[in-house]
Regions:
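ATP-dependent carboxylate-amine ligase
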Residues: 1-125
Length: 125
């Protein structure tokens, strides 16, 4: 995450990022991911990303500070988060949607839900 954000920040004045933290995995990494996003991104969209059987409230508590800045939006539904980010994105600012890549399913409460970040973005272009 650090490498890609740093690379984009070298080329662009502003960068927006959308990401989430997986459930039942790497709890200590969650807050580091958010802090990394804060270093490079002027706008952060925090959303779901394979919460598995872990409650999203627990994931948010691990990842986000209690005094959340205005530059961070929390939108639990990943599809809605992508829509909000794309529709509010100013021209000439890149939006980095991180974490899912080519995956076509989300694991939410141990239910497999069809979802593709790529398809979600393509709806707007």
């Amino acid at each position: 995450m650090n490498n890609i954000l740093a690379s984009y920040k070298e080329k662009y004045k502003d960068v927006w990022v959308l990401f989430g933290c997986g459930g039942e995995r790497d709890r200590p990494k969650r807050s580091r991911m958010y802090k990394t996003a804060q270093i490079y991104a002027s706008k952060i969209f925090f959303t779901s990303d394979n919460s598995r059987n872990e409650d999203i409230v627990s994931i948010k508590k691990d990842a986000l500070p209690s005094d959340l800045p205005d530059s961070t939006s929390i939108i639990e539904d990943r599809e809605e988060a992508i829509e909000s980010a794309v529709l509010s994105l100013p021209k000439d600012i890149p939006l980095l949607i991180l974490g899912r890549g080519h995956e076509e399913f989300l694991d939410i409460k141990n239910k497999i839900i069809a979802h593709s970040d790529i398809s979600s973005v393509k709806r707007f272009f």
